[in-house]
Amino acid sequence: MIFKEVFMKKLLTLVLALTTLALVGCGGGADNAGGKSEKVIKVGASPVPHAEILEVVKPELAKEGIKLEIVEFNDYVQPNLATNDKEIDANFFQHEPYLKNFVTEHPELKLANVLGVHVEPMGIYSHKIKNINEVKDGAQVSIPSDPTNGGRALLLLERAGLLKLKGGVGAAATVQDVVDNPKKLQFKEIEAPQLPRTLDDVDISVINTNWAMQADLVPTRDALFMEDKTSPYVNILVVRQGDENRPEIQALMKALHSEAVKNFINEKYKGAIIPAF
């Protein structure tokens, strides 16, 4: 009888202990659920340098309870579409002239430029010559096929003394706007990400810095001719219209204009990329 009473007391004690642990566990879960939850912001970016720059701001955003997820893209179309469709919260890969042209072609998109971050001077590259003055007659030249970067490439070729464009066309220039082509250059319009792959097939290629760097080219070393620091093509952070004042977006904007980001750009890219703030 005594044994039975002792056994029952121990069993009751064990049941109470397990019940208490279960309640404590449930209570902890409720506290976490009711506490301050981590906010997530997804930003689409080109791998180089945009995603690398975003990695720098992750720790600062984490201090504010914001988890930054970087979604890498290797084209110039999907990031804007994904932002508009709410698949991501923002994108960081393009300059203002490109955005304006893209929205003109896709008027259903409601996107806003909220911040300029850096400039990527476009350059002229070659695997066949070492100096821009060595460009031969009839040389094949690959340039970006999208309108704004194609026009930008033609302007750079004009600055390099290789051709002359119709007056006033600016960044909207096309191959048809070339009015003086003394070397009879032959143009190949290629999607911007593919331009580095054309270097073995053409004489010169005009390449955006991000794609050049992704192909292990060093602009300040390998470019035959580059845009200068006055380039108007500032790379920007883009969000959906109406999201400009979201706390997470504001925190991201502040972090991207920090001294940490400026120092990172200057130290890592050594003039190939220039802070715009």
Can you say where each PLM-predicted feature lies in the sequence?
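A bilobed periplasmic-binding-protein/Venus flytrap-type ligand-binding module shared by bacterial periplasmic
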Residues: P121-I132, V234-R246
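Bacterial signal peptide processing site
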Residues: G27-A30
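C-terminal motif of bacterial Sec signal peptides marking the signal peptidase cleavage site
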Residues: A22-G25
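Short, well-ordered beta-strand elements
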Residues: G35-V48, I66-E72, Q140-V141
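Short helix-initiation/N-cap motifs at beta->coil->alpha
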Residues: I70-L81, V169-R197
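A conserved helix-loop-strand patch within extracytoplasmic ligand-binding domains
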Residues: V114-L163, K262
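Periplasmic-binding protein-like
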Residues: N149-E158, L256-A276
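Ligand-binding "clamshell"
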Residues: N101-V114, K128-I129, D201, V206, ...
